[in-house]
Amino acid sequence: MKSDPIRLVAAGLLVCSLLMLSANAYGQSPSASDPAAVGKAVFKRANCVGCHKWHGNGGGGYGGDALSLRTTELTREQIMETVSCGRPGTGMPFFMRGAYDTTKCYDMNRQEVGNQIPPEANTFLRPSDIEAVADYVLAHIKGKGEPNYAECIAFFGNTSRVCDVYKTQATPAAGVAPSTGASK
């Protein structure tokens, strides 16, 4: 019995399509469909935690005393500009390729900003990454008050000992039972 070449090709294409769809469904990181997770991943990858800390309170790092993102009054656009262009005269690096060269920042080019030019980040971010990290800061850090156990677990996961310091601060309202501090 001879095989129908058209049916074989169609069956092969169907199998390949199903394999690609299943690979996308199972291989896709959950962050791709969750904007907050994308922003958090960028916050970690770009090492924002190096100066602003995981909770966004800032307070210092290798670049100096970083501003608190929890108390900032910056708008989304201003956060995006700060991430893109850094902060002249500070240790806050710029994350946009071409900042001060092909793109003016704060209405200045490299010559105009002079020796106050911010450092270049170790890695450049795409515009969509810059938007995602700004959205993450606005949704999960800005205006949130003091950091707590639930926020720490949301950032690091429940296997990190980093969050142990916040256990005594946890309240049932935050969805986490408070620790008594007693050990057995």
Task: Identify the meaning behind each predicted range.
Residues 67-69, 91:
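Conserved beta-strand positions that form and line the central face of beta-propeller blades
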Residues 40, 80, 84, 131-138:
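Non-transmembrane alpha-helical segments in soluble domains
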Residues 10-21:
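Bacterial N-terminal signal peptides
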Residues 21-27:
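Sec/Tat signal peptide C-region and signal peptidase I cleavage site
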Residues 1-7:
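N-terminal secretory signal peptides that target proteins for export/translocation
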Residues 60-66:
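Short cysteine/histidine-rich zinc-coordinating motifs and their immediately flanking basic loops
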Residues 50:
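Short, cysteine/histidine-rich loop/knuckle motifs that typically chelate Zn2+
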Residues 28-34, 45-46, 54, 93-184:
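Flexible coil segments in periplasmic/lumen-exposed cytochrome c-class electron-transfer proteins
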